Amino acid sequence: IQKLSNKSEVAELFHQNRETIESEALWFNMEKQLSVRRMITADHLDTMTKWMYDWWGKAENYSYEAVYSYMLHSLQGKRLPQTYGLFLDETLIGMYQFTMEDLFSRPDIYPWLANVYIDKAYRAYGYGRFLLNSVKKTAEKAGLKELYLFTTHEGLYEKFGWDFIQEIDTFLEPRTQRLYRLDTNSRLMSR
């Protein structure tokens, strides 16, 4: 396997061959440059706030300031919510959160994986796979025994060890979505 010298070469090669590459060596080269961490700067906070405001803040009639406050408080301390950034070297390219509440109609289940996001410029390069593969280990380190999520994606989260529980009425649009659970004590392998 050719030694790749920079992140753009790795990303481009992976993008060109993403359907056929099975090489662990290439994936390892990508992983050396990718990290998931909570060390977030003021610039990162601004970026994450913009992502979340554009994604759901506007649609749910939240002000930018309200989303900023939510994001700021999800970066502090060891309690939930907790926000994790996906970094390509030092560039923030994605994120996810562990929260106590994500679905208003189901306060009986928690904690949640929420706000899984990859910056549009970095989609289709395999970074989402890396991000989702990190969830279980990160949750274990945070002391979480299980996680829940709801989504319209069918077949995606199963690849990362999530178990489909049932279809649920979210009272959102779309109303019917899929509820999943991840046992952080079970073995995780992406397919």
Which role fits each region the language model picked out?
Residues 33-48:
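A short beta-loop-alpha structural element at the N-terminal edge
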Residues 141-145, 151-175:
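Conserved active-site alpha-helix within GNAT-family acetyltransferase domains
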Residues 42, 49-63:
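Helix-loop element at the rim of GNAT/NAT acetyltransferase active sites that forms part
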Residues 57-84:
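Active-site rim helix/loop that mediates acceptor-substrate recognition in acyltransferases
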Residues 83-85, 91-101, 112, 117:
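Conserved beta-strand in the GNAT
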Residues 4-5, 10-13:
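N-terminal amphipathic/hydrophobic targeting modules at extreme N-termini
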